[in-house]
């Protein structure tokens, strides 16, 4: 992917991109797997696309910021071909035929993260994200969700796969109360709500379809104790996701979690 960036206004940049990619998803469509009889299914996408991104940031840290704001707006257009191959080792009448589909779509997204100092020790952050994609469904439900937009506002959510927080159109909001224990220590809470406009559901044949508008709500929360260093940070956290049930996680991170940009942002 080739990108060209130019200054935009006083503290933003405009980025223009164009590229071609071949992406491959490997997966199973059921939780009951006999590895001696079944291999993974595979969906392959050959895609050409372009993008325009307007982005700016005055945050005081790459991660666990307490001051400033960040804003990003992106518009992207793609066209490409999807190929599907079943992993079934034995061919039966129920084995899917080789699949090929051409589709084009537009997607736009917006993110805003802002921090407001309420008192010398207390800061309140706010987060807003909106996403829209006109992309059609893939060959099956699992493939569709793997290519859908994902709501991942925290570092932990970026490295986990959670079907409940994926959709082709959604809105998400969040609040981040932060108490500054000292110059380097902070106690940080992050609480988010996620609403897919049309939730993607699975029918009895393993195909995707849209449910009724605004009939689903998910949430996630995380509390962390953060020690900021000049070269990174140390964070001990506990978090909870509304789906799947009883999804609690505890962990410790060292340094920064940095993620490369994706072909489809």
Task: Go through each PLM region and give its residues.
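Short, mixed-charge, low-aromatic patches
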Residues: 6-13, 126-134, 147, 207-211
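Flexible, solvent-exposed loop segments that connect beta-strands
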Residues: 30-40, 87-97, 153-158, 203-211
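C-terminal outer-membrane beta-barrel translocator/porin domains of Gram-negative envelope proteins
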Residues: 49-182, 186-192, 197
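Intrinsic-disorder/low-complexity loop/linker signature
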Residues: 120, 205-206, 231
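Gram-negative/organellar outer-membrane beta-barrel architecture
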Residues: 1-64, 69, 146-155, 163-171, ...
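Internal helix-turn-beta structural module
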Residues: 222-224, 228-232
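C-terminal hydrophobic structural anchor segments
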Residues: 178-222
């Amino acid at each position: 992917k080739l990108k060209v960036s130019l200054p935009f206004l006083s503290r933003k940049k405009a980025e223009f991109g164009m590229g071609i990619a071949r992406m491959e998803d490997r997966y199973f469509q059921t939780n009951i797997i006999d590895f001696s009889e079944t291999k993974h299914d595979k969906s392959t996408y050959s895609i050409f696309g372009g993008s325009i991104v307007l982005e700016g940031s005055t945050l005081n840290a790459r991660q666990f910021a307490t001051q400033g704001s960040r804003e990003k707006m992106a518009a992207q257009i793609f066209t490409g071909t999807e190929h599907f191959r079943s992993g079934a080792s034995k061919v039966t009448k129920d084995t899917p035929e080789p699949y090929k589909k051409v589709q084009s779509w537009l997607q736009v997204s917006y993110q805003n993260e802002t921090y407001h100092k309420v008192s010398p020790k207390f800061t309140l952050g706010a987060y807003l994200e909106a996403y829209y994609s006109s992309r059609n469904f893939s060959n099956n439900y699992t493939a569709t969700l793997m290519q859908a937009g994902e709501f991942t506002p925290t570092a932990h959510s970026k490295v986990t796969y959670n079907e409940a927080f994926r959709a082709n159109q959604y809105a998400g909001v969040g609040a981040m109360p932060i108490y500054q224990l000292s110059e380097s220590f902070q106690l940080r809470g992050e609480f988010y709500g996620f609403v897919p406009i049309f939730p993607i559901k699975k029918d009895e044949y393993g195909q995707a379809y849209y449910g009724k508008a605004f009939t689903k709500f998910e949430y996630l929360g995380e509390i962390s104790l953060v020690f900021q260093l000049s070269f990174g940070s140390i964070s001990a956290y506990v978090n909870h996701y509304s789906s799947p049930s009883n999804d609690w996680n505890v962990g410790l991170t060292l340094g920064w979690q940095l993620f490369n940009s994706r072909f489809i942002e």
